[in-house]
Regions:
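Structural detector for short beta-strands of small beta-barrel domains
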Residues: 14-45, 85
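SH3/SH3-like beta-barrel fold
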Residues: 49-54
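Generic detector of multi-pass transmembrane helix bundles and their immediately adjacent loops
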Residues: 200-335
Length: 341
């Protein structure tokens, strides 16, 4: 089949973009892009890459696609024969033969799919029946976020209020699948609810009094610049919702661990409420240190590039930066909810 043209003539007709998987067949020798160098001062070598389109309207076609390799690795997509990539295919006026094709990104789905498969197998093999139930609970939590939190937030609902509801629903669902209908599950649910409420209140207070805008991240700024949501209050609520959901996992972990430990102690022999309470407090103190470390280190790990970037900034300015204050508030609010679970 003859190669499809990878450029499209100027037209006033409407354009339609789709994304398709392609496989690199060959990579031409790079040549210096003098136009880009003279206009913006960026050193770029332009390659002509021959790509076979594996799906979509151009399936089976071989297209010649320009690929820019610049002096900034952020923008580079380095390919070789056999590399699978995601192609952006722009069709104007339904003229498929004149579609504009560009390399949008690497095709990462297969690697992620294999990683997910290994995770699921490990969960089922070592977790058994309870592991399968836990996976179902996890799937429900993901669906609640994807099909409830995101749509409602985009439709103007307060993200924090929606997140609290989702956290409670997720806690009840998870505890039911993990512990069934039992006193242990009820105790874990109540503990999780207390932790979630405390974390939510702490997050809202620090956002109000600091104050934090919720616009410190690049993603939030892009969302603010779009036509999706314009209200500034939305982003502070979105920040609080993110803090809450980020802490939910460890809060549930602590609640289940303490409830399970106290339940096992109660089975050994008759124990008074005071003795069981003391046992639960002792277990909670032991767990509190490790789980707080888990939460703080998780936020620290995700912010390592930020920490390197700001390491030379004076401490007075550092602590008061919106971006830094947001990360600190997220970690401490979640830890406070964990401690009071």
């Amino acid at each position: 089949m003859p190669p499809a043209q990878s450029s499209v003539a100027a037209s006033t007709k409407s354009s339609e973009e789709e994304f398709a998987v392609g496989r690199v067949l060959s990579v031409g020798k790079g040549t210096l892009n003098k136009e880009l160098l003279s206009s913006v001062g960026m050193v770029s070598n332009r390659q002509i890459v021959s790509v076979e389109v594996l799906e979509g309207k151009l399936k089976g076609c071989t297209v010649a696609v320009p690929n820019e390799i610049t002096d900034n690795p952020v923008f580079n997509i380095n390919v070789k024969p056999g590399t699978e990539v995601i192609l952006s295919v722009v069709t104007t006026g339904g003229e498929v033969a004149k579609s504009e094709v560009n390399i949008a990104d690497y095709h990462r789905a297969p690697a992620l799919g294999w990683l997910l498969l290994v995770f699921l197998l490990a969960f089922v093999i070592f977790g058994g029946k309870k592991g399968v139930k836990s996976l179902v609970a996890l799937l429900i939590s993901v669906c609640l976020i994807a099909f409830v939190l995101l749509p409602l937030s985009l439709n103007g609902f307060n993200p924090l209020m929606v997140a609290i509801g989702i956290c409670l629903a997720s806690a009840v669902t998870t505890m039911y699948f993990v512990a069934g209908l039992s006193k242990k599950a009820l105790a874990a649910i109540l503990g999780t609810i207390c932790g979630v409420i405390v974390a939510g209140v702490a997050a809202q207070l620090v956002i109000f009094y600091a104050p934090l805008t919720g616009l410190s991240s690049e993603e939030a700024q892009i969302l603010r610049g779009s036509v999706l949501v314009a209200s500034p209050k939305f982003y502070s609520g979105l920040l609080a919702a993110g803090m809450l959901i980020g802490a939910l996992g460890v809060i549930m972990d602590v609640a289940v661990s303490i409830a399970s430990a106290v339940s096992e102690v109660a089975k050994i022999g008759h124990r008074t409420f005071a003795e069981l309470y003391e046992s639960g407090m002792n277990v909670g103190r032991d767990i509190m240190g490790t789980m707080t470390n888990t939460l703080i280190l998780a936020y620290t790990g995700s912010a390592l590039p930020l920490l390197l970037l700001i390491s030379q900034i004076p401490s007075t300015k550092l602590v008061n930066l919106d971006l830094v204050a947001t990360e600190v508030a997220s970690a401490i609010s979640g830890s406070l909810g964990l401690v009071l679970t």
